Amino acid sequence: MSLDAAFLTALLLSTLRQTAPLLLTALGGMFSERSGVVNIALEGILLFGALTAAVVVERLEAALGPGPHPWLPWVGVLAAMGVGGLVAFVHALVSIKYRADQIISATAINLLALGAPSLVLTYFYGNATSSKEVANRLPLWGPEGFQLSPLVYVAFLLVPLTWWVLFKTPFGLRLRAVGEHPEAADTLGVNVHRMRYVGVVLSGVLTGLAGAYLSIGFLNQFVRGMSAGMGFIAL
């Protein structure tokens, strides 16, 4: 391979790897926005997802002992998605049921995500900046010289799938209806509150997935502030 080809390949790989978490977070945010709930808590959810994935995998490695455990990173991914969905549910609950200001609720989550990881890291690792490195990170798929995390492929495959769900399915029609014309949707029998809960929780699940990619796919540990504003960029 020539020097120019090697450079272009490395540039393309780097671009795809950096794009994946932004894409997952942006797709998640779109579900929330389409349902009529502003979710600027994506940055905080991204950090909570990354922290959860790294800590869960590292703690399980410590409990199970040395040796390859190829299924462990997928447990971390599921845990990150669950925590992301849970944090988003809290935002939805406060915003929808208790009618709190959506911006204030989301800002509170972002502020919590600035401090909570330090407490968790200090408790488990004795420092407030990073977790231990995990031995079982997400695998790489693809031909030699062009290998990517499976979550990169997932991120790009979700683009057409999300379009299809939002614009070609009854679920997508209802979700868009409650965001654009909630009164009209309600008169047609659509449960506006339930659809909004679903939209916000989906945004949290996808953003948690992006966080898992950052800590056990792109890197192999959690580092405080590793999202570097990606949640806000994705908005």
Outline where the language-model segments fall.
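Helix-loop-helix "hairpin" substructures at the membrane interface of multi-pass membrane proteins
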Residues: 146-222
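Hydrophobic alpha-helical segments embedded in the membrane of multi-pass proteins
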Residues: 19-28, 44-49, 86-89, 208-210, ...
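Membrane-interfacial amphipathic/re-entrant helices at transmembrane-helix boundaries
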Residues: 1-25, 38, 52, 60-75
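Alpha-helical transmembrane segments within multi-pass membrane transporters and channels
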Residues: 66-114, 157-160
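Short, non-helical or kinked segments that cap or interrupt transmembrane helices
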Residues: 33-49, 96-109, 198, 219-233
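Mid-bilayer segments of alpha-helical transmembrane spans in multi-pass integral membrane proteins
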Residues: 89, 111-124, 150, 161, ...
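Hydrophobic alpha-helical transmembrane segments
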Residues: 12-15, 23, 44, 48, ...
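Extracellular/periplasmic helix-loop junction at the C-terminal end of a transmembrane helix
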Residues: 114-144
